[in-house]
Amino acid sequence: EAPVLVHFHGLEGDSRSHYAEALMDHCVKNGVRGVVAHFRSCGGRLNRLPRAYFAGDTADNSWVLKNVHARFPKAPFFAVGVSLGGNQLAKCLGDLGKAASFVTGAASIGAPLDLVAGTEIMTRGANIFYGKMFLSTLKKKAEEKARLFPDIIDARAIRACKDLYDFDNVYTAPIHGFRSGMDYW
C-alpha cells in the first residue's frame, strides 16, 4: 500500500504555501499519499468558534493523524511539521505516547521551541517583515471573530496590537485559557 504523509504547516500557512505545495508535488511524483492539515481559520475559511490555534494546541493534530490513519490503516504513515506545525507535531506525538505507534516516522522542521525568543526575534532585523506579515493576517482573522463574538473578543484591542507580543497578550492567550502571552509561551 502507498505510504501516507501528513503535513502540518507553519504560522498562517496553508496548502498553498510554497513549501506545502513543493512537498505535496514530491509526494505525487513518488507515489505517496500527501495530506495537508489546515489549522483553524487557515486555508481560506474562518472557523466558527472564537478560538484559533496556538503552539501547544495538539487536539486537532491528534484528530487529523488518527482519522487519516483510520482511512489507510495498513499504509506506512509519516508526519512532518514545519515551524509552528513542527512544534505542534512534536508535542502531539509526545502527548499521544504509545497511542502514536502507528506513525512510522516524523520530522519537525524549524520548530520554534522557545516561543519567547521566537517572538522577540520577529521584532527586529529582517525578521520584522515576517512579524508584521503574520501580525497582519492574524489581526484580520481576530477582527472577523470579534464581529462574531463581540462579548469575548475586543476588536479595538486587536486593532491596537503593534506586534506578536501584543497579539498573544490580547487574543491568543485569553481566548485559549492562558493568563498572558508569557503564560502561553
Where are these regions (language model features)?
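Alpha/beta-hydrolase-fold enzymes
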Residues: 72-176
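Short beta-strand element of the alpha/beta-hydrolase
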Residues: 2-10
